[in-house]
């Protein structure tokens, strides 16, 4: 017999009453999702804590710290403050559905990763679709047992749902190490076997988990570490399992499932217009002054604008306006860094003839892929476009700004939480989670030993020019930045990347070794980044009261499955898609590999040529090193001003440098429409209609997930039905040639045309005493 479908009677955050139980205390209290609800009764009987020891832009200053709930309105509106420890979680159903999503979503995302514009299918898609799948499983699967495990454990619970979603999302992003493999294959003509590829991906993806375990006390337990992205998932979990509707009241409106279905179908149908029939609605080039894009691929290229607080989005867009709409044109039209001989915005390197594709690496490399200095002098220095050069300066600034910001704002909370256990946290969620046994430290140590062994095997068994001692240095960099970066991300939903600082360090340590440079960067940067994913998921489990041990294993297993699938997809693509990662794909299916090209350019700048010939004193890009000083001074200046004006808007200034870190491969086209939608949803609606926003904000998250999923599926269908067959010949003389599909290709920006053209046989160059501003370049025969 099959189990009848049962409603999940776990009360939702919008219930009239809830029970909380901890340390022998049992109480019933009324509460509501409505932020205007008066929750001040019996405050005298509650233990109160002081507000955070730093300015927290998410903190509700007008509300006393509540013992049985969070002081953050976003958390109170999305997270329930009780737990049912008897609820099934570690079931066969959860593992089967979770593994299924750990195969599908990473595979789809890896396919899109090499395309422009790309799109990322997030775990919210799995979260939404798993709900009807889980309920169908409860209804139709027989109640048998296999090896002592129930095929059908009964009703589909919210905790099972959380476990499935975590497995779907933990490996959803393209594994960073697959970039190393792609660059080795395309740029350095190295194609090592699958064993090397698998060990490299597993070591870089999992070693961060062992490090992330160290951060739980500081980044998960404190209430101030809200992790805004997890609240999106929490709100949707509670909405789905409480059977709430998209409209007002229980039956006045569409159900979440139907709302998602309508939005999904609409997005899938609409994408055919900008994605195939009228591509001028999608593709733009240059600096993005056209403002609008009608393609969700372009709008969400840097992430959904519906899940980040407006004050953080405002920081990002102000940084974009200052550095890319003001500074970049100023640099370009004054010909700083010889930039007029290149497009204002480009992803790759140029030589001194103004030709970029490709910068001829074979002319400056020895047979073992190491750097030949004399050949480099005989050939050409490496030049970058104005926006690419500025992006390095901003990356330098973000590194020092992160450390200084953490010292100024987070030193007190770090000291407090280092000495505080889960049970001692003044947050109800931490005290509830203290009832579950923690993950043993030797589990983290075991992952570290295995992944470190894989790393050493990759270094010793294959000709990568990497060293074991350099691996230690890379891991130390990740450890140093783990807490500062984590605290910033937990509050702002923006992560500070360590890719450039690791590139700079290894460039000086191991000059002339491009593959070693890419490996060092990946272990130094992705160790920290994966630790953030691990920690973010643990915060989701913290909010949803998931025991830590099942959380740990579902993340590890799903990461192994996802990484293996992504390697399979990548190898298939390079074997079956013609001219992949070449300029010819720009006019075919779009598989130009923009992310990979940026990765390869960095390997040339920092790995082949090295920072000594690019950024040291007397070199062309030496002025960019002053951004390290700028990054250190700016947070200090803002901090001093906030001491003088404690209630001013300056308290919200903190993301100017790192917010635009996705340029390149992103461009202005991706930032402007993203900011416009973010302003509407996170400022206008939230500020003017806060009760409405608090109650229905997760509808925007459902909409975002539906747009992601519908666009992704439609893109796949368009590609495999209309573009992949016959090598793209379908409609070549008809639909592909009409004005709406060609007009955007008739611009100088699209053709990467520079402002100045080097005459045939001439070269441009620079003088040794180059200044940050001024005419330092000239075109003359062999004038390098």
Report each predicted region and the residues it spans.
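Alpha-helical multipass membrane-protein architecture
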Residues: 2-784
């Amino acid at each position: 017999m099959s189990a009848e479908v049962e409603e999940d009677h776990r009360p939702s955050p919008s219930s009239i009453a809830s029970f909380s139980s901890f340390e022998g205390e049992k109480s019933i209290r009324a509460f509501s999702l409505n932020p205007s609800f008066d929750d001040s009764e019996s405050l005298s009987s509650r233990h109160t804590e002081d507000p955070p020891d730093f300015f927290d832009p998410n903190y509700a200053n007008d509300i006393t710290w509540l013992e049985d709930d969070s002081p953050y309105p976003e958390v109170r509106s999305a997270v329930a403050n009780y737990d049912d420890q008897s609820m099934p979680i570690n079931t066969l159903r959860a593992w089967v559905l979770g593994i299924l999503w750990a195969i599908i979503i990473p595979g789809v995302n890896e396919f899109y990763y090499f395309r422009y514009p790309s799109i990322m299918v997030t775990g919210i898609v799995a979260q939404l679709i798993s709900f009807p799948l889980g309920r169908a499983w409860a209804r139709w699967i027989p109640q048998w047992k296999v090896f002592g495990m129930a095929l059908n454990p009964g009703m589909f619970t919210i905790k099972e749902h959380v476990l499935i979603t975590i497995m779907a999302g933990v490996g959803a992003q393209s594994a960073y190490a697959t970039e190393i493999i792609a660059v080795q294959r395309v740029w350095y003509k190295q194609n090592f076997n699958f064993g090397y590829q698998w060990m490299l991906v597993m070591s870089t993806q999992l070693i961060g988990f062992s490090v992330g375990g160290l951060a739980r006390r500081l980044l998960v337990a404190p209430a101030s570490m809200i992790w805004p992205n997890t609240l999106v998932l929490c709100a949707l979990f509670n909405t789905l399992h409480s059977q709430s509707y998209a409209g007002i009241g229980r039956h006045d409106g569409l159900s979440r499932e139907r709302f998602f279905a309508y939005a999904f179908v609409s997005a899938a149908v609409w994408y055919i217009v900008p994605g195939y029939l009228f591509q001028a609605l999608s593709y733009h080039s240059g600096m993005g002054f056209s403002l609008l894009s009608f393609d969700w691929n372009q709008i969400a290229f840097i992430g959904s604008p519906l899940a980040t607080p407006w004050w953080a989005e405002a920081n990002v867009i102000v940084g974009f306006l200052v550095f890319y709409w003001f500074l970049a044109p100023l640099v370009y039209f004054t010909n700083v860094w010889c930039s007029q001989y290149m497009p204002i915005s480009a992803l790759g390197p140029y030589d001194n003839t103004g030709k970029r594709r490709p910068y001829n690496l074979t002319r400056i490399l020895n047979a073992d892929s190491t750097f030949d200095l004399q050949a480099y002098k005989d050939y050409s220095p490496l030049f970058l476009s104005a926006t690419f050069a500025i992006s390095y300066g901003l990356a330098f600034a973000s590194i020092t700004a992160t450390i200084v910001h953490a010292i100024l704002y987070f030193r007190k909370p770090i000291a407090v939480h280092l000495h505080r256990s889960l049970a001692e946290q003044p947050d109800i969620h931490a005290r509830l989670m203290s009832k579950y046994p923690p993950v043993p430290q030797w589990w983290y140590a075991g992952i570290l030993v295995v992944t470190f062994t894989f790393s050493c095997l990759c270094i010793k068994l294959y000709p990568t020019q990497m060293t074991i001692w350099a691996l230690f240095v890379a891991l130390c960099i990740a450890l140093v930045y783990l807490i500062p970066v984590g605290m910033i991300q937990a509050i702002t939903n923006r992560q500070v990347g360590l890719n450039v600082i690791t590139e700079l360090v290894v460039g000086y340590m191991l000059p002339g070794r491009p593959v070693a440079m890419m490996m060092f960067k990946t272990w130094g940067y992705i160790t920290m980044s994966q630790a953030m994913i691990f920690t973010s998921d643990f915060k989701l489990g913290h909010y949803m009261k998931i025991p830590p041990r099942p959380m740990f294993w579902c993340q590890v297993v799903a990461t192994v499955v996802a990484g293996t699938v992504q390697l399979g997809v990548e190898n298939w693509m390079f074997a079956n898609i013609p001219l992949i990662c070449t300029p010819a794909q720009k006019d075919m299916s779009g598989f130009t590999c923009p992310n990979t090209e940026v990765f390869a350019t960095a390997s040339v700048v920092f790995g082949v040529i090295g920072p000594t010939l690019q950024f040291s004193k007397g070199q062309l890009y030496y002025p960019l090193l002053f951004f390290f000083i700028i990054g250190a001074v700016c947070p200090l200046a803002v901090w001093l001003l906030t001491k003088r004006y404690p209630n001013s808007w300056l308290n919200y200034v903190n993301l100017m440098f790192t917010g635009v870190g996705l340029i390149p491969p992103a461009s202005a086209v991706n930032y402007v429409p993203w900011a416009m939608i973010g302003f509407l949803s996170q400022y206008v609606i939230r500020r003017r209609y806060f009760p409405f926003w608090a109650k229905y904000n997760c509808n925007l998250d459902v909409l975002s997930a539906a747009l992601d999923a519908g666009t992704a599926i439609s893109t796949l269908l368009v590609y495999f039905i209309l573009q992949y067959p016959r090598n793209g010949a379908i409609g070549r003389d008809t639909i592909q040639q009409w004005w709406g599909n060609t007009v955007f290709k008739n611009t100088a920006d699209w053709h990467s045309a520079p402002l100045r053209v080097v005459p045939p046989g001439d070269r441009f160059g620079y003088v040794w005493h180059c200044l940050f501003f001024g005419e330092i370049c000239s075109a003359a025969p062999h004038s390098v």
